[in-house]
């Protein structure tokens, strides 16, 4: 425990802030190229095949990114836009692909409906407004 005179001379070191998405380097999004597109299984209580891709960003960093929505058209060498935001049940996945930009098409929507269009939360999945 320092004395008051020691604190006056030296001061305390400010706590360093640790960013949740370091590969973005203080940018809202980054462009990258898919190196590998694959599926992974989530952590213990959940069970699924989550669609993810390994992306080499424009700043030469390589990150794992989640592909949201139902169905996608991404493959190796697809150019994608990456935003921050982790997936809680996939360890090491701290980024999301932005749907509806660059090579990532908008999501098709829930397959349970007979017409495969997404009418709600469209902006999250890059889906255009339906005609009527």
Curated annotation (Swiss-Prot):
Q: Which PROSITE patterns match?
A: RIBOSOMAL_S12
Q: Which residues carry this modification: 3-methylthioaspartic acid?
A: 89
- Family, per entry: Belongs to the universal ribosomal protein uS12 family.
Q: What Gene Ontology terms describe where this protein resides (cellular component)?
A: small ribosomal subunit
Segments carrying the region annotation (Disordered) are 101-132
**Function text:** With S4 and S5 plays an important role in translational accuracy. Interacts with and stabilizes bases of the 16S rRNA that are involved in tRNA selection in the A site and with the mRNA backbone. Located at the interface of the 30S and 50S subunits, it traverses the body of the 30S subunit contacting proteins on the other side and probably holding the rRNA structure together. The combined cluster of proteins S8, S12 and S17 appears to hold together the shoulder and platform of the 30S subunit.
Q: Where is the composition biased (Basic residues)?
A: 117-132
Q: What is this protein called?
A: Small ribosomal subunit protein uS12
Q: Which GO terms describe its biological process?
A: translation
GO MF, one example:
rRNA binding
Native organism = Sorangium cellulosum (strain So ce56) (Polyangium cellulosum (strain So ce56))
The record's section on InterPro entries has:
NA-bd_OB-fold (IPR012340), Ribosomal_uS12 (IPR006032), Ribosomal_uS12_bac (IPR005679)
- For this UniProt record, give its keywords in alphabetical order, as a comma-separated list: Methylation, Ribonucleoprotein, Ribosomal protein, RNA-binding, rRNA-binding, tRNA-binding
Q: How does it assemble?
A: Part of the 30S ribosomal subunit. Contacts proteins S8 and S17. May interact with IF1 in the 30S initiation complex.
């Amino acid at each position: 425990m320092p004395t008051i005179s020691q604190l006056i001379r030296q001061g305390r070191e400010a706590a360093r802030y640790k960013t949740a998405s370091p590969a973005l380097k203080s940018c809202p999004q980054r462009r990258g190229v898919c190196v590998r597109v694959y599926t992974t299984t989530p952590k213990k209580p959940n069970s699924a095949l989550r669609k993810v891709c390994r992306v080499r960003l424009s700043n030469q960093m390589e990150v794992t990114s989640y592909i949201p929505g139902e169905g996608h058209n991404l493959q190796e060498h697809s150019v994608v836009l990456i935003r921050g935001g982790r997936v809680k049940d996939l360890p090491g996945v701290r980024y999301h692909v932005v749907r509806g930009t660059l090579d990532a098409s908008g999501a098709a929507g829930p397959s349970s409906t007979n017409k495969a269009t997404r009418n709600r939360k469209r902006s999250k999945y890059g889906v255009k407004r339906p005609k009527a």
